[in-house]
């Protein structure tokens, strides 16, 4: 059973900590890099407000990504907007069932140490956790001793990358899965307007192919 912690009394946020994972605690106590992932369209196929565990299907190569992170002792953290909760399409219990199935499919021996979720919709206040707010990532960094400057964020939407950029993550990766195809031009235009001092250009990949995993491994080892 997944451990859960309600971070706010209004239940707009939920965090799952995987305490049993060997990578949960930093052995040295020092800051360490992590891989931050969006969920829908990156880890699992985006099926438009998924609420049933039977509909969970991993994106291509996701297990290989987790295996790579595990072999390099790099923790993985998922950050996800779940506006279907505030819209009334499903509740937190439904979300947890989907989460349990996702973790099961990733397999038990993986590097996932936490999942941060926000249940608010597009009209969420600016101080909420909803991406593009950096607050989910910043909370993860504080609680799990993550060095954001050496971390990676992988997303299919511009909001994922802005969330990472505004939290201090330098390595941004955009995938074509999920909403990636429709978002890519928007992302290219956004970062073309920024100077090199403001942000590094994102790395663009199609999916978690063997070639893409080599790129991710090179970033981690650099």
What does each model-found stretch correspond to?
Residues 43-45, 86, 160-161:
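Catalytic P-loop NTPase motifs of RecA-like helicase/translocase cores
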Residues 1-31, 93-113, 122-153, 157-222:
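Asp-based, Mg2+/Mn2+-dependent phosphohydrolase catalytic module
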Residues 3-77:
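Active-site neighborhood of HAD-like aspartate-dependent phosphohydrolases
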